[in-house]
């Protein structure tokens, strides 16, 4: 329905957006390159939680690129604010932000995507849209303004979606460390009685029942890459960036 908030499985709404990298047409800019993209909104530039998020996204930028995924931010701030904030982050924290940020001072884009906070029409919530190479929305995530995102989980989601697409499998909870089937991927269930019976008799898959079968078609590299995201999210940083930046500034 035109004007309604988009849903998972729908094509991302067509729009032209102004960013600090210039005007970008969504989703065609990425679809024409055969790329997925992650659009994520933040409440405001020059705020602490948002700064920590952008540093985290930037430090994982190459991980997203290896997956064939581009990043694009969004807030109701101006292009000039985005530019100065990026400069501040690089100068004071030592991290360059390589991806564009949409400037949406009127809230037009945020309103179209359902990203405005119920109690503040001037701030976007921490939303995430994961959009595939066809321009179809595959995942939508919403976080409150006071909680920063776990960027390694967003990487894991993208990795799992792309792997599931290529192998025609569904991905279980906590993959690749699921407590029932480990790194296994779930085989789509049969749709007829004959198929269900044949599946149980064939022994092709490991099964708890005809509707719950799995195998392990993912490569070791794919599994270990996903585990690396989880390990990094759980590990304590060897050194805090603010300490490095403070040393550099002084």
From Swiss-Prot:
Disulfide bonds join 207-213. Its EC number is 1.11.1.24. One of its GO terms (molecular function) is thioredoxin peroxidase activity. Induction: Up-regulated by hydrogen peroxide (at protein level). The active site is at 50 (cysteine sulfenic acid (-soh) intermediate). Substrate binds at residue 126. Residues 6-163 form the Thioredoxin domain. Keywords: Antioxidant, Cytoplasm, Disulfide bond, Oxidoreductase, Peroxidase, Redox-active center. One of its GO terms (biological process) is cellular response to hydrogen peroxide. It catalyses: a hydroperoxide + [thioredoxin]-dithiol = an alcohol + [thioredoxin]-disulfide + H2O. It comes from the Archaea. Belongs to the peroxiredoxin family. Prx6 subfamily. HAMAP family: Peroxiredoxin (MF_00401). The active site is a conserved redox-active cysteine residue, the peroxidatic cysteine (C(P)), which makes the nucleophilic attack on the peroxide substrate. The peroxide oxidizes the C(P)-SH to cysteine sulfenic acid (C(P)-SOH), which then reacts with another cysteine residue, the resolving cysteine (C(R)), to form a disulfide bridge. The disulfide is subsequently reduced by an appropriate electron donor to complete the catalytic cycle. PANTHER family: ALKYL HYDROPEROXIDE REDUCTASE C (PTHR10681:SF121), THIOREDOXIN PEROXIDASE (PTHR10681). Thiol-specific peroxidase that catalyzes the reduction of hydrogen peroxide and organic hydroperoxides to water and alcohols, respectively. Plays a role in cell protection against oxidative stress by detoxifying peroxides. Homodecamer. Pentamer of dimers that assemble into a ring structure. This is Peroxiredoxin. It comes from Aeropyrum pernix (strain ATCC 700893 / DSM 11879 / JCM 9820 / NBRC 100138 / K1). The lineage of its organism: Archaea, Thermoproteota, Thermoprotei, Desulfurococcales, Desulfurococcaceae.
């Amino acid at each position: 329905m035109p004007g309604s908030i988009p849903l998972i499985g729908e094509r991302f709404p067509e729009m032209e957006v102004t960013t600090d990298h210039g005007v970008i047409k969504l989703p065609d800019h990425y679809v024409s390159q055969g790329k997925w993209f992650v659009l994520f909104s933040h409440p405001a530039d020059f705020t602490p939680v948002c700064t920590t998020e952008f540093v985290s996204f930037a430090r994982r930028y190459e991980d997203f690129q290896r997956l064939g995924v581009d990043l694009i931010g969004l807030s109701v701030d101006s292009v000039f604010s985005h530019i100065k904030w990026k400069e501040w982050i690089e100068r004071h924290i030592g991290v360059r932000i390589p991806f564009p940020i949409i400037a949406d001072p009127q809230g037009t884009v945020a309103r179209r995507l359902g990203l405005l906070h119920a109690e503040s029409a001037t701030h976007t919530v921490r939303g995430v849209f994961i959009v595939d190479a066809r321009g179809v929305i595959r995942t939508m995530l919403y976080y409150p303004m006071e909680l920063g995102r776990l960027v390694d989980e967003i990487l894991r989601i993208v990795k799992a979606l792309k792997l599931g697409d290529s192998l025609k499998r569904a991905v279980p909870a906590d993959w690749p460390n699921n407590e029932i089937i480990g790194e296994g991927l779930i085989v789509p269930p049969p749709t007829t009685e004959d198929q269900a019976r044949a599946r149980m008799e064939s022994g092709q898959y490991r099964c708890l029942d005809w509707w719950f079968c799995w195998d392990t078609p993912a490569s070791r590299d794919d599994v270990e890459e996903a585990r690396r995201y989880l390990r990094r999210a759980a590990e304590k940083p060897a050194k805090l960036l603010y300490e490095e930046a403070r040393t550099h500034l002084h």
